[in-house]
């Protein structure tokens, strides 16, 4: 299971940042990045993600047992348990799989109806969407229905409230407040006024950006709320490093972690290799830029590890894209402040973002 998940998390970590390098090459032909740099950023980020997550395993898996739904892990466990018992226990699993597969085949392949129901299909809904920018949408996919069942009513309700806030408050609100204005400071390709856009366009150009900002702020709040967890994990590591409590021989194997001494040594070694990679492979021998880069990567990756863990434990989805965008913004501002600009600065920020993004994706995946 871990081997299968590992490939997906590595790809998820790299896909948000590294393709941007090749997209920018169309505008800046002098920008070039070798495959080795792309490979190293994913490799080092993946190792850091695993090492940073281990100290928090006990908190998420043991201390918070029964309090977090862990939707994806719960679904996987139920499949394994039902399959192991066989007979009558496996029968509902097989029936559910057949029903879900048949339903998705009818919707996604045969197209008997649209997977995403929208109020635009009725006359009054189309009028409300065009005039007031009010749209009601429901994704009827079997996977979404199953996710809602797994995470429970509380967290499903919170997710729905977020959707309502975007589609029924932010989208029509922006149309009312900025009806005759062209808001294109961050995207010069936008030429329409907000009022001339459809509700879907307002969501695409502005609603998503506001949501990403919300994720970034939630990440900061998550770090603040998780500060006690972070201190506890660091204190436990320091205590063991000094020769404190060790795992008892009677401790169940599945409750044992790698020794903190090993984690500390491996983390330091990985960070040292990352620093050398930044120094000679990304920053072209500039020591100051390399030091700033490794400090940013270390602090952001470690602090956001708890946020990734919380997100996976609650909704089963890792908001790694929002946290990566925040990393890119911080990295760009800091690197420009210390003097790294131009295409070199773009490549450096994206490589650093790739390391952090892969680390967070790997931490959430495991």
Residues covered by each model-derived region:
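Alpha-helical multipass membrane-protein architecture
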Residues: 1-366
């Amino acid at each position: 299971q871990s081997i299968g998940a590992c490939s997906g998390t590595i790809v998820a970590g790299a896909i948000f940042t590294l393709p941007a390098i090749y997209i920018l090459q169309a505008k800046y032909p002098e920008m070039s990045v070798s495959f080795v740099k792309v490979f190293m950023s994913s490799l080092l980020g993946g190792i850091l993600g695993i090492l940073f997550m281990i100290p928090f395993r006990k908190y998420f898996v043991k201390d918070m047992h029964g309090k977090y739904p862990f939707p994806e892990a719960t679904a996987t466990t139920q499949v394994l348990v039902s399959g192991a018992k066989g007979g009558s226990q496996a029968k509902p699993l097989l029936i559910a799989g057949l029903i879900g597969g048949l339903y998705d085949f009818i919707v996604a392949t045969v197209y008997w109806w649209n997977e995403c129901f929208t109020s635009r299909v009725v006359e009054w809904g189309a009028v409300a969407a065009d005039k007031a920018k009010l749209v009601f949408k429901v994704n009827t996919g079997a996977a979404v229905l199953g996710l809602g069942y797994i995470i429970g009513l509380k967290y499903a309700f919170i997710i729905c409230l977020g959707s309502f806030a975007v589609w029924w408050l932010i989208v029509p609100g922006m149309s009312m407040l900025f009806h005759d204005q062209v808001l294109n400071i961050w995207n010069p390709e936008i030429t329409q006024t907000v009022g001339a856009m459809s509700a879907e366009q307002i969501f695409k150009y502005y609603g998503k950006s506001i949501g990403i900002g919300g994720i970034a702020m939630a990440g900061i709040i998550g770090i603040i709320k998780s500060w006690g967890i972070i201190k506890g994990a660091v204190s436990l590591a320091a205590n063991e490093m000094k020769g404190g409590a060790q795992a008892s021989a009677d401790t169940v194997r599945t409750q044992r972690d790698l020794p903190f001494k090993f984690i500390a040594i491996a983390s330091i070694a990985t960070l040292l290799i990352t620093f050398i990679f930044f120094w000679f492979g990304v920053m072209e021998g500039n020591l100051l830029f390399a030091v700033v880069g490794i400090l940013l990567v270390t602090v952001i990756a470690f602090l956001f590890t708890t946020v990734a863990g919380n997100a996976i434990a609650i909704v089963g989805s890792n908001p790694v894209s929002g946290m990566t965008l925040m990393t890119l913004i911080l990295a760009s501002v800091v690197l420009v402040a210390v003097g790294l600009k131009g295409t070199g600065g773009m490549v450096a920020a994206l490589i650093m973002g790739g390391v952090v993004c892969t680390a967070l994706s790997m931490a959430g995946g495991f």
